[in-house]
UniProtKB/Swiss-Prot annotation:
This is Chaperonin GroEL. The keyword Lipid biosynthesis does not apply. The lineage of its organism: Bacteria, Pseudomonadati, Pseudomonadota, Gammaproteobacteria, Enterobacterales. Its EC number is 5.6.1.7. GO terms for cellular component: cytoplasm. It comes from Salmonella gallinarum (strain 287/91 / NCTC 13346).
């Protein structure tokens, strides 16, 4: 086991604070509408330019191991805030730095660290309740666009795109961000349910110009089995032909004689049919077939529940207004399933999301909810260069997370104003002893830090602006972009409540642990002794060269 280097008390805390300050100072230059960029060197390819706090934090590793421990703990604050709300990483870092700095001063002055932590925790718990009371629901497109704009560093086009995407696919819809091909940002919306399975035979194509199969008002047969014998399907095919409507078959597979017969019937115009494989594998395939059945008002024909394909009737088939199939995807538009059944299915999947243990499972379940409840929108980010593309894409993803958080828990006044108001409301909070009261004051002082940093990044005097904002009430604050005072919500400067709450809670959590640190342990650096054997060999070879 390697020897350890151990530091105690003030020596440990000073080193830790130095690491905290290096990381926080690098991150906090990005805060606010006039925050600066940070350039990150990469071992290959062009450097990355970013204004995303967590991206900067993740790049920082310090040579001194004790300082690095401090930096890594604050990095954890940024990562946790990012995981919880997708934004607010810089705010969380600024709050953590302030609590740690003021807290360690109090420890050096002889306060009890545990009581300080209890005071900080008490203030934060009270502040969170006040934040919830200040929160305003965020439901209209204008507010969603404003939240997106602020989170994307005052880029209005991004805010509008996200609001438009949410408008099209609903609050539950899936919105993804991809690299675009042009200079302009674009929004692609897929209505209805789309899954990644294309037609089983190109002979089903009835729109040669687009290479797609389009079926108007089709019946939809859902079978959880392989279909290879056409006899099983004859009763259904005859019933569909009599009804004079097309048929879409979604099954585990359609092969051999069955597929050949369907193709022949389609080409002769006897009945219009298309077949696709069911999406997913194993249990997930069964679940997705059931989703499609709910959406289209049909029944999954499965031998597990005693249903046979030969006995299927038109009542067992689902229906939709339109189906479009190309070689890779199938889209079902306007299924006729009942709204109550769809909502029931969505509620059931939501329950599974809460119980899911892996991120992958959770993501797949959320996709299923979106396909049932809304649709899928893709924001394609346009830029002139790859460096700009990466930077812009990161901003759009941040803005998307922020708007989701806003829809979930509402919004508060932005620009650090909400925390100032909360601090003034709990200014009379008292702990059980004087040390806890100091902890409460440390937390209240930290709540001013985001506003002060935003103002500092604009080149103004933080104390003057902070005192002016404190003198106002409600949503009165400082618009750093225009350097004007006014009602922040009216000016469209909003922060999601969840983002502000998460930033404060995670900052206080990690900072409280750091204040109570009394000892730090790390590995001693290994001494790299030169390999004398190798050096001697080289010398000998040199001598031989001289003789020749």
């Amino acid at each position: 086991m390697a020897a350890k280097d151990v530091k105690f008390g003030n020596d440990a805390r000073v080193k830790m604070l130095r690491g905290v300050n290096v990381l926080a100072d690098a991150v906090k230059v990005t805060l606010g509408p006039k925050g600066r960029n940070v350039v990150l060197d990469k071992s290959f390819g062009a450097p990355t330019i970013t204004k995303d706090g967590v991206s900067v934090a993740r790049e920082i590793e310090l040579e001194d191991k004790f300082e690095n421990m401090g930096a890594q703990m604050v990095k954890e604050v940024a990562s946790k805030a990012n995981d919880a709300a997708g934004d607010g990483t810089t705010t969380a870092t600024v709050l953590a730095q302030s609590i740690i700095t003021e807290g360690l001063k109090a420890v050096a002055a002889g306060m009890n660290p545990m009581d300080l932590k209890r005071g900080i925790d008490k203030a934060v718990a009270a502040a969170v309740e006040e934040l919830k009371a200040l929160s305003v629901p965020c439901s209209d497109s204008k507010a969603i666009a404003q939240v997106g704009t602020i989170s994307a560093n005052s880029d209005e086009t991004v805010g509008k795109l996200i609001a438009e995407a949410m408008d099209k696919v609903g609050k539950e819809g899936v919105i993804t961000v991809e690299d675009g091909t042009g200079l302009q940002d674009e929004l692609d919306v897929v209505e209805g349910m789309q899954f990644d399975r294309g037609y089983l035979s190109p002979y089903f194509i009835n729109k040669p110009e687009t290479g797609a199969v389009e079926l108007e008002s089709p019946f939809i047969l859902l079978a959880d089995k392989k279909i290879s014998n056409i006899r099983e399907m004859l009763p259904v095919l005859e019933a569909v032909a009599k009804a004079g409507k097309p048929l879409l078959i979604i099954a585990e597979d359609v092969e051999g004689e069955a597929l050949a017969t369907l193709v022949v019937n389609t080409m002769r115009g006897i009945v219009k049919v298309a077949a696709v494989k069911a999406p997913g594998f194993g249990d997930r395939r069964k679940a997705m077939l059931q989703d499609i059945a709910t959406l289209t008002g049909g029944t999954v024909i499965s031998e597990e529940i005693g249903m046979e394909l030969e006995k299927a009737t038109l009542e067992d088939l689902g229906q939709a207004k339109r189906v479009v199939i190309n070689k890779d995807t199938t889209t079902i538009i306007d299924g006729v399933g009942g709204e109550a059944a769809i909502q029931g299915r969505v509620a059931q999947i939501r329950q599974q999301i809460e119980e899911a243990t892996s991120d992958y499972d959770r993501e797949k379940l959320q996709e299923r909810v979106a396909k049932l409840a809304g649709g899928v929108a893709v924001i394609k980010v346009g830029a002139a260069t790859e460096v700009e593309m990466k930077e812009k894409k990161a901003r759009v993803e941040d803005a998307l997370h922020a708007t989701r958080a806003a829809v979930e828990e509402g919004v508060v006044a932005g620009g650090g104003v909400a925390l100032i108001r909360v601090a003034s409301k709990i200014a009379d909070l008292k702990g059980q002893n004087e040390d806890q009261n100091v902890g409460i004051k440390v937390a209240l002082r930290a709540m001013e830090a985001p506003l002060r940093q935003i103002v500092l990044n604009c080149g103004e005097e933080p104390s003057v602006v902070a005192n002016t904002v404190k003198g106002g009430d409600g949503n009165y604050g400082y618009n750093a972009a225009t350097e004007e005072y006014g009602n922040m919500i009216d000016m469209g400067i909003l922060d999601p409540t969840k983002v502000t709450r998460s930033a404060l809670q995670y900052a206080a959590s990690v900072a409280g642990l750091m204040i109570t640190t009394e000892c730090m342990v790390t590995d001693l650096p290994k001494s790299d002794a030169p390999d004398l054997g190798a050096a001697g060999g080289m010398g000998g070879m040199g001598g031989m060269g001289g003789m020749m």
